[in-house]
Each structure stands twice: as C-alpha cells, then as structure tokens.
C-alpha cells in the first residue's frame, strides 16, 4: 500500500486548508458584490470540451479510462463556456458567473514520469458584452479582488497585459515564411535565434527593439504607433489603460504592456493578462485570464451572438505570498472540556454545547480525567488554550 500521495497531488495540513477556505471566501464575497452568480462545473468532462477547440494540448489533460473519451478538467473556463452556451443560453446577457474548485494538469518530466499538478482555482466568467467594456470590468474586478486579499506590498504585484492582435500587427511586416519563426523568437525572448534569421538591417533592429519592448503602457503604445501608425487595437488599449490606471496606482499595482507576451493556453482571441507577484524565492503568477470569443462561439448555435472573457486565481499560489496573516484567525481561543470521575461524556457534551452557543471553539476530552491537574496537562497536547473542568 502506498504511504505517500501521488506525485504532484496536494495533501494540505489544517492551517493550509483554513487559509485556502478564507482566501476563497474573500474572493467569493467580492464576486457576489459585482453581481456574479456561483456555478459548479463538473470535474470530469469530455475531451473535446476540455481541449477547448485545440487551445489546450491533450497531453496536459489527465485522462480517465472509461467507455467515453473523458478527463479531469485542467481549468474551468471551457466547462463554464459550454454551460453558458447551452444550459444558460436563455439567460439575459451580460451573464456573470463565478466558480471555485480543484483543477488537474498532467505533465511529463525529463525522466519520462507523468506528474499530476493539482491546484485550487477561483475565478469569474463574463458573457455577452461586445466592446472594451467587458475587459474594463474584468480588469477592475481583478484589481479590486487583489486588494481584498490583503497581500503585502512587498509582493510588488505587476499586472501584465497584451492583446493577441498586437503580435499579428508586429509580424505583419515580416515575410510569410518567417512569421512563425518571428513569433516564436519574440514569445521565447530568444536573442540567439534573431541572428540566424535572414533579415535585412532594419528588420533585425526592429525585432530587437520589439523584444525589449515592455513596461509603461503609454510608452509601449507610443513606440508601437511610431512603428505601425494608428491602429484600432492600440486606441482600444489606450482607453482601457486610461480607465484602470488610476485604481492600479491607488493600490500600488504596476501596469505593464508586453506585446510579445503569449499565454500558455491558445484559446484567447483578445486581451490576455497575468497578475505576477514576488515571493521570497521567485515571482509567481497568481491570476491569469483574457478574452475568448472563439471558444464560446464553438459551443453556441448562434456563434455570432456570443462574446466572453474571464480570469482565475490560483489559491495555492496566493497562499505562498506574504499575505497579512492577521486577517486569518490563526489563534482562536480553543477550550478543552474535560470531566472527572463524578461526571460523564453526556455532561461534557452539554457543557460544550453551551460554549458553542457563545461562539467559542470547544472540544471534548473523550476519556474522563483523574483530576484537574491531569486535565491541565492535556490542554497543550490537544492544541487548546484554556480548560473547562467539570467534576461536581
């Protein structure tokens, strides 16, 4: 019999579970204030849905061996998009949904071993609004919810944003044969491969400039306009940044526009973003999302009618941050109810019930104690802070 959990799966201690629950609760509270309704997408879905129209590699899906091709969800967006386009298709738009749950990813290590990555996610999906307003609401909600989590400023959060069409704009000036290679070079920040490409002097310099082009949205947009002229996407991004910049400054969240940023999943068709925070060891992505019109249209009988975007937080990654732990009730008063030879377990339960009614955490010492001194010695062992002794 195995004595350890499966490689990559999570086994949390009580403190971690408590923190996860509190973080998820904090997020759900703000989702509800913004009018989002909770749904519970299935953990097991058909592979066609889980692959999100080819946006998610089947190798990342943990497959189950049954009659139908199914697997465990590697994320929740595709399942919620399917539900929005079928079960909730008659619901008025905009349709605001949120969900929280465990996701499972499969990956192969260098030695060939298959590892399961299990994590707790919480996020929102917004359906049915065409135009930049959908992105504005989601980015604003993302920033507001981050503030609700009371993450310490030492985490120095950065909201990294891009638009899928910016990469298309960038590669438009390159030859058809080199476009795919240029995309890979920019996405992977590959300086060596630039020198191997057959480019003229101006193209090579432009590519090097673009590879370094990230940071202040205003400066990046200005540079892109100088290279490619006025563009609807750049105009839309300017309007979005003008709206969200004041709140990001208020909460000390740095905004960055990175035209070469490419999300891991290829299901997005508009704005994409990641929320990155520093830990004691390395930066971590605690949230990611974007617009995925094509995915939701795949499930809809009237595809021209449906628009969608969303984001999700990784609760486990947030827990790694320097969160202000005073927001967690980590040391509540815990009362040990112990009884002596003259009392019974029934007396202890009645006493415990009265303490519970007053709001205390109270646990029972199931065996009777010889005397009060004996009971006092058990207080620390039972991880309690106080003794309630009953014997007469």
Curated annotation (Swiss-Prot):
Gene3D superfamilies for the chain: Bira Bifunctional Protein, Domain 2
Entry GO CC: cytoplasm
Transmembrane segments: none
Subcellular location as annotated: Cytoplasm
InterPro entries attached to this UniProt entry: aa-tRNA-synth_II/BPL/LPL, HisRS-like_core, HisRS/HisZ, HisZ
Record has Amino-acid biosynthesis as a keyword: yes
Annotated NCBIfam families: PRK12292.2-1
Subunit structure, interactors included: Heteromultimer composed of HisG and HisZ subunits.
Free-text function comment from the UniProt entry: Required for the first step of histidine biosynthesis. May allow the feedback regulation of ATP phosphoribosyltransferase activity by histidine.
Stated name of the protein: ATP phosphoribosyltransferase regulatory subunit
């Amino acid at each position: 019999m195995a004595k350890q959990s499966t490689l990559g799966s999570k086994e949390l201690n009580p403190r971690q579970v408590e923190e996860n629950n509190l973080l998820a609760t904090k997020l759900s509270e703000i989702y509800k204030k913004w009018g989002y309704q909770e749904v519970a997408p299935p953990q097991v879905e058909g592979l066609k849905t889980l692959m999100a129209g080819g946006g998610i590699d089947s190798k990342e899906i943990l497959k189950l061996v049954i009659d139908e091709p199914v697997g465990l969800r590697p994320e929740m967006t595709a399942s919620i998009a399917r539900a929005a386009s079928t079960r909730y298709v008659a619901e008025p738009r905009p349709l605001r949904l949120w969900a929280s749950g465990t996701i499972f990813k499969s990956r192969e290590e260098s030695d060939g071993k298959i590892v399961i990555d299990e994590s707790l996610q919480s996020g929102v999906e917004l359906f049915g609004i065409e135009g930049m307003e959908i992105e504005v609401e989601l980015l604003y909600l993302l920033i507001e919810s981050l503030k609700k989590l009371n993450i310490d400023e030492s985490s120095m959060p950065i909201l990294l944003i891009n638009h899928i069409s910016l990469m298309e704009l960038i590669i438009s000036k390159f030859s058809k044969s080199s476009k795919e290679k240029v995309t890979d070079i920019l996405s992977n920040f590959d300086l060596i491969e630039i020198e191997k490409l057959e480019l003229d002097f101006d193209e090579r310099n432009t590519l090097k400039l673009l590879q370094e082009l990230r940071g202040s949205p205003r400066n990046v947009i200005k540079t892109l306009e100088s290279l490619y002229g006025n563009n609807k996407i750049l105009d839309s991004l300017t309007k979005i940044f003008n709206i969200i910049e004041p709140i990001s400054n208020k909460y000390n969240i740095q905004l960055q526009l990175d035209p070469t940023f490419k999300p891991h999943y290829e299901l997005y068709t508009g704005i994409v973003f990641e929320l990155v925070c520093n830990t004691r060891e390395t930066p971590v992505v605690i949230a990611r999302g974007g617009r995925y019109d094509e995915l939701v249209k795949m499930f809809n009988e009237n595809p021209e009618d449906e628009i969608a975007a969303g984001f999700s937080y990784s609760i486990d990654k947030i827990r790694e941050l320097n969160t202000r732990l005073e927001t967690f009730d980590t040391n509540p008063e815990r009362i040990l109810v112990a009884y002596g030879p003259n009392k019974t377990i029934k007396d202890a339960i009645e006493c415990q019930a009265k303490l519970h009614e007053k709001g205390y955490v109270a646990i029972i010492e199931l065996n009777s104690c010889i005397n009060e001194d004996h009971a006092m010695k058990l207080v620390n062992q039972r991880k309690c802070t106080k003794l309630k002794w009953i014997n007469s």
